[in-house]
Amino acid sequence: EKYVYLKTGVRHNTVAGYKTVINILKKEAFGRQRIDKVRLSDAKAWLIKLQQVDGRGYSSIHSIRGVLRPAFQMAVDDDLIRKNPFGFELASVVVNDSVTREAISRKQERDLLKFIKEDKHFSRYYDGIYILFYTGLRISEFCGLTIQDIEFEEMRIKVDHQLQRTSQMEYVIQQPKTESGIRYVPMTEEVASCFRRIIANRAHPKAEPMVDGYAGFLFLDKNDMPMVALHWEKYLEHIVQKYNKIYRIQMPKVTPHVCRHTFCSNMAKSGMNPKTLQYIMGHSDISVTLNVYTHVQFDDAQAELLRVAKA
């Protein structure tokens, strides 16, 4: 709790994560131990118990350890303990069972967008989902877009804030995590057409919702409040469910993050310069962008080899 108290100026998502870890510790016998009594083997045994007995996933345990390791490091720095019991490699103790969110193929993307466009009910979400697939925006960046952020003359999207809704149902505007998150994302003519339709069909509420000084959000829900990530996650979930009831060849799970990952993967496969792609994606670290280049399949490798051979 002292560690959390000293962490000022952190994002509300981070604070929520800290509270979750504190609540978990309060319920556990491990959490009642004195810090100078916690051994390396105790820390490992507890994390194994979280996975094998409590059924927690790797990513959840990774987040818990991500709070406890720096908290114990603070105790080391304060000379309260000699060594950090959480200073070990997590994957050496807990099985990584997390499912990576793969990009979908170009054919799957085409099939899904065609299905959405032609569906009587879901066609209303076509423009928004098309934009997600063809800009690579984070869903919180997309939800935060206002009419003023779409610069049609320059054919670009201004990205300098994110919209999120807290667990207390409060709407908040946040700045991107890093400077790299502030950028202009170029638009194709098709993306610009989607934005034009969205703005033309946008509801006109009696009172424009305002969040931290921002107004003119592109998508509003039935309560005339800006749509948030959860809305789009649910729309995509229901779309894929309906698609899979109709077609024999099943569509994998598609989330807004899968749309972003698919865009990134498609750009990498098309031979886009990694530094250019890093800028468009808003990645602070080039290694995150380069990881996408590792998602190539044999067909991609074969096509690339033939292309170079012909050059």
Regions found by a protein language model. Give the residues of each.
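N-terminal core-binding DNA-recognition domain of tyrosine site-specific recombinases/integrases
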Residues: 2-80, 98, 120-123, 225-231, ...
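Generic recognition of well-ordered alpha-helical segments
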Residues: 20-24, 45, 66, 70, ...
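Alpha-helix C-terminal capping/helix-coil junction sites
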Residues: 51, 76, 132-133, 268
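Basic, Lys/Arg- and aromatic-enriched nucleic-acid-binding interface segment
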Residues: 62-66, 77, 81-145, 153, ...
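Conserved tyrosine-mediated DNA breakage-rejoining catalytic core shared by Y-recombinases
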Residues: 90-91, 145-203, 210
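Short, basic (Lys/Arg/His-rich) helix/loop patches that form interaction surfaces
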Residues: 114-125, 135, 185, 201-210, ...
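Short, polar N-cap/turn motifs at the start of nucleic acid-interacting alpha helices
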Residues: 149-156, 272-292
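DNA/chromatin major-groove-contacting recognition/catalytic segments
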Residues: 168-173, 270, 291, 295-311
